[in-house]
Amino acid sequence: MEKHIFCNLDLLRLNLPVPNIKTICRSFVNYMKEINKDTDTYIYFVSRNRNDLNDAKEAYTDRGYHGFNFIHRITAGDAVRRRNHQNQQFIFISGKDVDFHLAVNSQSLFIVPDWIPNESSARKYGVVVDTPLQLFKFIKTLYNQQSWFAKSIIEPGVTALSLMDARYRSKTYTDNERDMIINFENLLKRGRSRNYYDILMYHFLAGMTNTTLFDNIELFGMIPSSDCSLNPDLFSFMHQVRVIKNRHIPRNIPHGENILLRMVPKLKAHESYRADERANMGAIDEFRTLCVNPDFKNKIDTLRRENRLNLCIFDDYMTHGNTFNAVRNLFKALGANKMVFVSLGSFKQPFRKKDYTINGSVYNIGYTYSLNQSSVKYFDYDDNAKYEVDELYDIFNQDD
């Protein structure tokens, strides 16, 4: 796939107050030269200072780096806006907020090198890399990331995805994957190593870069926990994707910024029901406690009138799809055009599709529902996704 990589000129500065900056800069330049050998890759160094651009161009051309382009930030912005429908082709590497906003406006991937000056939004929402080697390896994964661990077209306009296998006890393929999934359950991995949410975020962003599936998503949300709270790590994951995709929430949100609310706690299904009961219970447990946030009603009504009511909903796990079933039916009742359900982990069970007729307002609990029909949808599994996650684990948890 053709890629256009826009690098802030800070990446070539040798006077940054960073230990071994000359070695770091030389390593970065050589890795970018290696990436540039791909005939479908174009590398641009960007600045608003034309004199700095001319000096850098002269210096690096004299050293034999003929594949690099040096362009003004206005020129870069114009080029991106002209090809805004081709956002999968763009990668931005910078620590500047101005570059971050250009990436967001074009819904492009934004990578933040830790060794150059970082501004607040860039560092908060970008993919942070610690070394030139991490940067090089991560960019290479963008060329190869083609796999979701599990995918199923539930019905026209509704897709369910899972990023990784959640069955670590007997089914994982590598030690790294086992480590990832154990931490996926206990949330204990912190400190210097990348949190597993970060690894899955990078995996998701790499996949999102290579598909148009998410381009027209207007609303992002997540499944509330059984106790009505929002898992802070999953919320951060969802929020980061929403910001990167340049999607906004309503201004007045007394009920919070998640599109789904759990109004009363519910029993955890795996602690309260037998396996066969969970497989066949459908959305009933969810309907009793789950509703759409009324703060989003005006926005939802507007999107529906414009045929743009397209949503992406995140959850930690998918077993039988009971929660996603509930959400699918709630938003079908509101006239949704497109829904993408993304679970971070899958237990490799079929999706138990159940279609309901819903009466009453779905903006509070108390609506009524009746089952119309049931069917089973199977997932396509791709074990290549296991190795892609495994590779990212290695990239971001190694000593360079």
Place the predicted regions along the sequence by residue.
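Acidic, Mg2+-coordinating phosphoryl-transfer loop and its flanking beta/alpha structural elements
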Residues: 91-129
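Active-site-facing substrate-recognition patch
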Residues: 141-219, 227, 267-304
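Substrate-recognition element of Asp-dependent hydrolases with the DxDx(T/V) motif
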Residues: 20-60, 70-73
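PRPP/pyrophosphate-binding module of the type I phosphoribosyltransferase fold
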Residues: 15, 272-369
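Conserved Lys-Pro-Asp/Glu-containing loop-to-beta segment of HAD-superfamily phosphomonoesterases
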Residues: 77-98, 310-313
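Short glycine-rich phosphate-binding loop at a beta-alpha junction
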Residues: 44-46, 91, 215-226
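PRPP-dependent phosphoribosyltransferase catalytic core
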Residues: 132-172, 325-400
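Asp-based phosphoryl-transfer active-site loop
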Residues: 2-22, 313-315
